[in-house]
Amino acid sequence: MPDKRKIEMYKSMFLSIAVLLSGTSLACADPAADALATHLYAGTLDGGKEALAALPDDAGKKSAEGILAFVTSIEKLGQGLHRHGLETHPGGMMMQLPVLRMPVPANPSPEPITYEKWRGLLEALLADMAAADALLAEGAKGEANLPLDLLKIRLDLDEDGKTSDAESLGGIMAAVTRQPLPEGSAAKMEFAFDKADVLWLRGYIHFLSAALQFGLAMDFEDSFNATAHAWFPRSGLPFAEALLKPTAPGAGFADNSIGDALAFVHMMNWKVADPARLSDA
């Protein structure tokens, strides 16, 4: 008859291996986890904010609110880019810059964009991420367990009150990388979103914020007016009609794209307009 102690040892080993292989945690998810996942997957971010506000205050709730606030900041940026008619062409050299690589639905009637409006979009993103970071800082004081599949998160980028597969993070990732997502159960990007993940997200926000502060410290109006038609071709920019030629998706680097990129680089002798932002970066 097997030794009882060996049986218990084998049972413990089997349980440990099963947990490791399954990629799940025995820890119970926070009460905020269901509300967070439900609304992120549905793209109903305002509803998620209301649902989380109704829960008791604890570290899990604050972390969930911070995650939701960060995703909302990305949605608001995407809505602003769509409103002004951002067009991303995979073959364009000017499409390699951060923020402007974000694919948004086509807008047949974009609002005009100016240098001041562009700075306003970046300043709003900076403020929204700071608010998200403040919530995450509160959440990081305790533990959290907020399982999420990032590829299922949906955004309403064109402000039509609906979401599509192209507006999911999975769809956005596929468009940016130009690689289709795996089919079936392989198409997952699951995170436990525990305290370590919350701290990582705070670090990522700080990195993005530093880059934004550095850019906003500069006066880059001449560069914007001369080259931003590469991103916003139908938004009333000065040289759009004279310089822009249609670029078919996947057509490689068009002549106008190379010219815009060279002009952008050669005009980067920007003056510091707001020195205080450099110390904040």
Where would I find each of the regions flagged by the language model?
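Short, Lys/Arg-enriched N-terminal segments with co-localized hydrophobic residues
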Residues: M1-E8
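Bacterial N-terminal signal peptides
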Residues: F14-S25
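Alpha-solenoid helical repeat scaffolds
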Residues: S63-E65
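Short coil/linker segments at helix-helix boundaries
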Residues: P31, A35, H39-G47, F70-A281
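Residue-level recognition of tetratricopeptide repeat
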Residues: D58-K61
